[in-house]
Amino acid sequence: MGLFDIFRPTDINEELKTMKETPGAVLLDVREVDEYEEEHIPDSVNIPLSEFDQIENMHYEKDTPLFVYCHSGRRSGAAVLRLRELGYTNAKNIGGIIHYKKV
């Protein structure tokens, strides 16, 4: 996966299906707390991008499948870049909640 693939639009609904089929996967919402409280995808964990160094306190293994979303996909792309800098090898930007369809 190349650098620009991190920001390439994906279908969040398809990615969520993949996440549910992936053992040990974590759904990570990197929006601010107030955005998360207003609306979020069930079973997601909120770590705002602005407080992202907290990820190290979550004790995820470096190869944990992390499916990352935000509002539109931009912050989640930045979060995936930061995760890679921190050594996480299995993080994926799945886009924005604005395209999420509740099923």
What is each of the regions a protein language model found here?
Residues 1-38:
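Flexible, polar/low-complexity N-terminal or interdomain linker segments that lie immediately upstream
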Residues 7, 31, 48-50, 95:
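Residues at the C-termini of beta-strands that transition into short coil/loop
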Residues 27, 44-46, 91-93:
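Conserved beta-strand scaffold positions in the cores of enzyme catalytic domains, especially
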Residues 34, 51-53, 98:
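Acidic phosphotransfer microenvironment of two-component signaling modules
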Residues 36-42, 101:
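Short loop/helix-cap segments at secondary-structure boundaries that form the rim of catalytic
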Residues 43-67:
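Helix-loop module immediately N-terminal to the HCX5R catalytic loop
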Residues 58-100:
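Catalytic cysteine-centered active loop of the rhodanese-like fold, especially the PTP/DSP P-loop
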